[in-house]
């Protein structure tokens, strides 16, 4: 970004000068500083640093440990096809290969879309299909890398796997995202956590979840990751009871030339969860009715997508719909949003999240701004112009190379927090906990949309200050995450099935 002229008028406690004042990437670190008590946070010097364009970014190669590559079992899709949606199998002894099938159901590529500028697509969303969150699978002594594209586990031979470590790689995201890389990793960790919870649940594998406990980068070195500054501290999922507490260790220094990443790593290491392991609870709301669109879980995961455009165009479009969206689809979305994250700290952080939605063309609901609370939608302001107002304040508007269907979308959902309240209740841990909780919730919304024959696109590109005016948020609230729920447009493009 270009440094602005020195004189400017601050519109809110968190603001930047010049045309970049609504840039969500640049605003993120200011909200963190505001939460910690700075009433008028100033942008750090690296805000104005010149960075390569995102499209020039080449992600680093997989962090493969030494050792053989073992192919995962096939047949996961057939097993999911035999599970009627929305039913979840009753608890019982899991098959010997159940964990491996759950991993394939969570992380395995679903399809490739040749006309889409970003590929491949998994059961959960990821910006630019970068998938910065990696899974390592171990037996308590050694670890192997899960390589979804190769449908394999790579690394030293181990006993039967009992532990999964989830960690996000900051350097998988273009450096142009600067401090925002930390937020993208935390949000995607929440999405992955729900996707994995669902996979384990569908294959009958109970588990516990252990959050990072502080103490430094020792857990990353146990995974074989010596460049610890590239990675977030891992969350552990155990299928044979909670595993051992990882030893402490110091981080390797961040190389010169990326000052924002130094701050990202410091913030991640400050987020120390006070509670220990907790059961991995359900990812699926109870009492969902049978859906007329998807007969089984394989079809649901196939239908999840973020909106498509033809001819390699970017963005998304929401097609016209002759009849309103049935009320039952919004009721199901509310049910999915109401399932709390599995760990007590995450669940408490999600209680601090406000969910606001702009609704239109949905049976039984007036067009306007609604607040989603306790499984119900409460009208805050009748406003048929709100969808157009949102599109006008979206960072990637309609253009010859970009689609933008927000003005036509039946539902756009916003997850917001008050950073001061988060820090007062949880300390620095609240920042990441709220982001994980919002990622968990939005993946549920994505699945609800797929079950209704709709798409859901998680986004962070709304211009925050004018968007908050449209949906009625206070100046001390920040938008953690949004999702546009629209009607899929038929593009005529191929969808290559990559499932196993």
Provide a role label for each language-model segment:
Residues 1-438, 444, 451-500:
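N-terminal accessory segments that position/regulate proteins before the catalytic core
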């Amino acid at each position: 970004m270009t440094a602005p002229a020195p004189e400017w008028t601050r519109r809110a406690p968190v603001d930047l000068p010049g045309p970049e004042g609504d840039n969500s990437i640049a605003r993120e670190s200011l909200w963190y500083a505001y939460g910690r008590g700075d009433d008028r946070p100033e942008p750090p010097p690296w805000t104005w640093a010149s960075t390569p364009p995102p499209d020039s970014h080449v992600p680093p190669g997989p962090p493969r440990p030494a050792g053989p590559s073992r192919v995962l079992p096939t047949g996961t899709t057939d097993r999911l096809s035999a599970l009627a949606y929305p039913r979840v199998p009753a608890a019982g002894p899991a098959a010997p290969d159940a964990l491996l099938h759950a991993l394939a159901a969570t992380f395995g590529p679903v399809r490739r879309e040749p006309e889409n500028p970003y590929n491949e697509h998994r059961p959960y969303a990821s910006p630019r299909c970068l998938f910065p969150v990696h899974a390592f699978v171990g037996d308590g002594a050694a670890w192997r890398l899960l390589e979804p594209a190769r449908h394999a586990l790579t690394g030293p031979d181990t006993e039967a796997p009992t532990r999964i470590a989830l960690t996000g790689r900051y350097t998988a995201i273009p450096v142009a995202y600067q401090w925002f890389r930390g937020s993208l990793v935390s949000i995607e960790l929440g999405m992955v956590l729900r996707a994995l919870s669902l996979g384990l649940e569908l294959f009958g594998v109970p588990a516990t979840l252990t959050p990072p406990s502080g103490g430094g980068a020792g857990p990353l070195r146990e995974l074989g990751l010596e460049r610890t500054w590239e990675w977030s501290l891992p969350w552990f999922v155990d299928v044979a009871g909670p595993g051992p507490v990882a030893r402490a260790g110091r981080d390797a220094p961040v190389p010169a030339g990326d000052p924002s990443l130094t701050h990202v790593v410091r913030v991640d290491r400050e987020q120390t969860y006070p509670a220990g392991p907790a059961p991995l609870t359900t990812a699926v709301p109870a009492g969902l009715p049978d859906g007329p669109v998807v007969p089984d879980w394989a079809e649901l995961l196939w239908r999840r997508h973020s909106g498509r455009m033809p001819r390699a165009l970017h963005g998304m479009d929401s097609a016209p719909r002759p009849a309103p969206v049935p009320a039952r689809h919004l009721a199901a979305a509310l049910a999915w949003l109401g399932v709390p994250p599995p760990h007590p700290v995450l669940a408490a952080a999600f209680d601090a999240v406000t969910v606001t939605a702009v609704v239109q063309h949905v049976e039984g609901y007036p067009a306007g701004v609604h607040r989603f609370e306790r499984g119900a939608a409460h009208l805050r302001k009748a406003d048929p112009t709100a969808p157009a107002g949102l599109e006008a304040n979206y960072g990637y508007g309609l253009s010859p190379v970009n689609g933008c269907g927000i003005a036509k979308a039946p539902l756009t959902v916003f997850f917001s927090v008050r950073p001061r309240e988060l820090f007062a209740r949880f300390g620095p841990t609240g920042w990441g906990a709220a982001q994980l909780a919002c990622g968990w919730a939005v993946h549920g919304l994505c699945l609800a949309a797929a079950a209704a024959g709709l798409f859901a696109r998680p986004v962070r590109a709304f211009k925050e200050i004018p968007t908050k005016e449209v949906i009625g948020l206070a100046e001390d609230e920040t938008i953690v995450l949004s999702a546009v729920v629209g009607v899929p447009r038929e593009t005529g493009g191929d969808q290559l099935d990559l499932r196993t």
